Regions:
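Primarily recognizes the serine-hydrolase "nucleophile elbow" in alpha/beta-hydrolase
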Residues: 90-156
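Catalytic active-site module of serine/aspartate enzymes centered on a nucleophile-bearing elbow/loop
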Residues: 202-237
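Catalytic histidine neighborhood in serine/cysteine hydrolases
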Residues: 180-198
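Catalytic histidine-centered segment of alpha/beta-hydrolase-like enzymes
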Residues: 80, 193-208
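Acidic catalytic loop of the alpha/beta-hydrolase fold
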Residues: 141, 164-169, 195-196
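Short beta-strand/loop motif that positions the catalytic acidic residue
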Residues: 153-155, 159-162, 166, 190
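Serine-hydrolase catalytic machinery in alpha/beta-hydrolase-like enzymes
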Residues: 19-103, 196
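N-terminal cap/lid segment of alpha/beta-hydrolase-fold proteins
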Residues: 1-30
Length: 237
């Protein structure tokens, strides 16, 4: 089956602080899930156009799923003001509400760094969300400690993917965080990669394709998704 995803600018995604700039990669009519991907810390350049976010979107689009990305409040053209991760949780919930209204299908979530923390806070325990992908989950970054006691009630299937040289969450710490979560969870450590999935055991190089492949493999194994013969989206990144 050949499928060509289109990319749409959304004008009607609104959070508590106003309009949220967003892109929707369209999916097939019979897609069994929709997907949401959230970006890293906006005060350090994170937006929905981040390379890790883009590759996570491609992982979901590989199966013909509609994929929503948006900029947190105060980021780029999104209205409002950055709220240190508190109001951003409500932004994620607004995006979940949008997907539910538009598609009425189970949702798969992926977030990178700050986006994984805020996204997990919003999605853990939400019955609309069927599975969780945490990329580069931060534990200590930019002078802030991120804590994950809330994972003790997070029963959805989840996967944690990080680089072996992630400066914001060493692999042994990530394993401890994952083990605090009940239910089904997996961890994948990419040897040689840093927080942004750059670097190999032998030198420089990107590991984004490998990261994307791990997401796809996990989705096939956990949710029995079938890859489509995809053509590239018509616009945007």
């Amino acid at each position: 089956m050949s499928f060509q995803s289109h990319v749409r600018n959304l004008d009607d995604l609104r959070g508590p602080d106003g309009r949220l700039e967003a892109l929707l990669n369209t999916g097939t009519d019979d897609a069994p899930f929709t997907a949401l991907v959230t970006h890293p810390h906006p005060l350090f350049g994170g937006t929905m156009h981040n390379k890790v976010v883009y590759h996570a979107m491609k992982a979901f689009s590989h199966f013909g799923l509609p994929v929503l990305r948006f900029n947190f409040r105060g980021t780029s053209r999104s209205e409002g003001t950055h709220d240190g991760g508190r109001g951003e949780i409500d932004d994620v919930r607004a995006a979940l509400d949008y997907l539910t209204r538009t598609y009425a299908k189970p949702i798969l979530f992926a977030g990178f760094s700050f986006g994984s923390y805020t996204g997990l806070r919003a999605t853990c325990g939400d019955p609309r969300v069927a599975g969780l992908v945490a990329l580069g989950l931060p534990v200590q970054a930019a002078g802030r400690n991120y804590t994950y006691e809330f994972l003790s009630t997070c029963t959805q299937p989840k996967v944690f993917i990080s680089g072996g040289n992630d400066e914001f969450c060493p692999p042994e710490v990530l394993q401890q965080v994952a083990a605090s979560s009940p239910g089904i969870w997996d961890t994948f450590i990419i040897p040689g990669a840093d927080h942004f999935f750059q670097g190999t055991l032998t030198g420089p190089g990107s590991q984004l394709d490998g990261m994307r492949g791990l997401i796809q493999t996990w989705l096939i194994h956990k949710f029995h998704l079938k890859p489509l013969n995809l053509q590239e989206p018509l616009a945007h990144s």
